[in-house]
From Swiss-Prot:
The record marks T53, K111 as: Stabilizes the phosphoryl group. Pfam families: Hydrolase_like (PF13242). Monomer. This is D-glycero-beta-D-manno-heptose-1,7-bisphosphate 7-phosphatase. It is found in: Cytoplasm. It catalyses: D-glycero-beta-D-manno-heptose 1,7-bisphosphate + H2O = D-glycero-beta-D-manno-heptose 1-phosphate + phosphate. One of its GO terms (cellular component) is cytoplasm. Signal peptide: none annotated. Mg(2+) binds at D11, D13, D136, K137. Substrate binds at D11, R12, D13, D19, H20, G21, Y22, T53, N54, Q55, S56, R110, K111, K137. The gene is gmhB. Its EC number is 3.1.3.82.
Length: 188
């Protein structure tokens, strides 16, 4: 029987990197201060790290899937060079009003739907109750709730925090950089 592992599900734009809007080029990708160290610490604490990101810019024709994949590969290698190995990267290229027909659809992977988290759970054998979802928007919290993620963490490094998002979260932190110490404090 497979051993189940706890995970940190991570939104990308506004959580891992500064959200400049439809980030798809290496030059525009800027890691938020402290997140790489935090991710390294979370790995040491025994968590799988799984990126779950809506990328509607693909459906909207702002950038191609190939451009997204090139940037994602660069991000993955940049993190690996700093001793942060991601366990999974899941993305949704769809949008119901997309201008690119192949990606114009209602799907179950676009947050607030839980599809990406469920796929990761099944593939990586994740213990959802012991896991955390970290994101900057209400949709991240809703996806986590729908997937039965144990702790929903809203961060202030992305979109302005709304009261609705705050109410949907279990924790509100200034940044992903603060998560390792928050988890340690809670586990005492």
């Amino acid at each position: 029987m497979a051993k189940f592992v706890p995970a940190i599900f991570l939104d990308r734009d506004g959580t891992i990197n500064v959200d400049h809007g439809y980030v798809h080029e290496i030059d525009a990708f800027e890691f938020i201060d402290g997140v790489i160290d935090a991710m390294r610490e979370l790995k040491k604490m025994g968590y799988a790290l799984v990126v779950v990101t809506n990328q509607s810019g693909i459906a909207r024709g702002k950038f191609t899937e190939a451009q997204f994949e090139t940037l994602t590969e660069w991000m993955d290698w940049s993190l690996a060079d700093r001793d942060v190995d991601l366990d999974g990267i899941y993305y949704c290229p769809h949008h119901p009003q997309g201008s690119i027909e192949e990606f114009r659809q209602v799907c179950d992977c676009r947050k607030p739907h839980p599809g990406m988290l469920i796929s990761a759970r099944d593939f990586l054998h994740i213990d959802m109750a012991a896991s955390y979802m970290v994101g900057d928007k209400l949709e991240d919290m809703q996806a986590a709730a729908a997937a039965n993620v144990g702790t929903k963490v809203l961060v202030r490094t992305g979109k302005p925090v709304t009261a609705e998002a705050e109410n949907a979260a279990d924790w509100v932190l200034n940044s992903l950089a603060d998560l390792p110490s928050a988890i340690k404090k809670q586990q005492k």
